[in-house]
């Protein structure tokens, strides 16, 4: 579960496991062009970075783990609903991205289901990831899509 703080000078996301225990946290750099997020475990060890590539018509994000770029997420042009291309082993996003109820697939295998909880103070997202090995990348994908949606809304 991801919870965004409502009143903060920088965006901070607290990420909890299925039992409500803190598992990760995300810090967003404040004075940057484009989004730049660092994901940490509870021992303050950085586990990944998401940064927005600038000079693109639509939002593009690179996902780095261990200093290596492992994925790229790009918003595609679409008239009515947001669509994304994910450059990672054929992963695809399907569902209602505006309503925050969507799935991430690898072929026909559902990797993750993402939904937004309503009537909460601040944005709260629930992420169900089927395989623990996909947890970090699945989490980073959700954060990048959230940032891309925010980028488009502020344009």
What kind of region is each of these model predictions?
Residues 1-155:
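Intrinsically disordered, low-complexity proline/glycine-rich segments
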């Amino acid at each position: 579960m991801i919870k965004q703080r409502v009143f903060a000078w920088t965006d901070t996301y607290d990420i909890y496991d299925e039992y409500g225990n803190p598992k990760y946290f995300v810090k967003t750099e404040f004075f940057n062009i484009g989004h730049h997020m660092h994901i940490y475990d509870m021992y303050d060890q950085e586990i990944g970075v998401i940064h927005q590539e600038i000079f693109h018509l639509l939002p593009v994000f690179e996902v780095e783990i261990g200093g290596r770029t492992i994925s790229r997420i790009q918003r595609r042009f679409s008239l009515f609903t947001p669509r994304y291309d994910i450059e990672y082993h054929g992963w695809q996003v399907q569902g209602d991205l505006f309503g925050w109820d969507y799935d991430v697939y690898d072929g026909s295998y559902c990797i993750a289901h993402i939904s937004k909880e309503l009537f909460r103070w601040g944005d709260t997202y629930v992420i169900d990831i089927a395989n623990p090995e996909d947890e970090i990348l699945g989490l980073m994908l959700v954060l990048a899509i959230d940032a891309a949606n925010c980028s488009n809304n502020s344009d």
